[in-house]
Curated annotation (Swiss-Prot):
Protein name per the record: Small ribosomal subunit protein uS14
Organism field: Ruminiclostridium cellulolyticum (strain ATCC 35319 / DSM 5812 / JCM 6584 / H10) (Clostridium cellulolyticum)
HAMAP family noted in UniProt: Ribosomal_uS14_2_B
UniProt subunit comment: Part of the 30S ribosomal subunit. Contacts proteins S3 and S10.
SUPFAM superfamilies on file: Glucocorticoid receptor-like (DNA-binding domain)
Similarity annotation: Belongs to the universal ribosomal protein uS14 family. Zinc-binding uS14 subfamily.
GO biological process, one term: translation
Keyword Cell membrane: no
Record keywords: Metal-binding, Ribonucleoprotein, Ribosomal protein, RNA-binding, rRNA-binding, Zinc
Matches recorded under InterPro entries: Ribosomal_uS14, Ribosomal_uS14_bact, Ribosomal_uS14_CS, Ribosomal_uS14_sf
GO molecular function: rRNA binding; structural constituent of ribosome; zinc ion binding
Lineage: Bacteria, Bacillati, Bacillota, Clostridia, Eubacteriales
Gene name linked to the record: rpsZ
Top-level taxonomic group: Bacteria
Note on cofactor: Binds 1 zinc ion per subunit.
Length: 61
């Protein structure tokens, strides 16, 4: 889990627009963010295994 202070700090609008960055909507993780879903890869994996993300299935080739 991300530090509460960093999550709150990130929610404020930054002084310069280039300082803005994405965080996971579930756990607040700043790295490995998947834009299409708005969550990090770890939360994505958990939700995909539970079947809570529609249209996502395990790849097989």
């Amino acid at each position: 889990m991300a530090k509460k202070a960093m999550i709150i700090k990130q929610q404020r609008t930054p002084k310069f627009s280039t300082r803005a960055y994405n965080r996971c909507k579930i756990c607040g993780r700043p790295h490995a963010y998947i834009r299409k879903f708005g969550i990090c890869r770890l939360c994505f994996r958990q939700l995909a295994y539970k079947g809570q993300i529609p249209g996502v299935k395990k790849a097989s080739w």
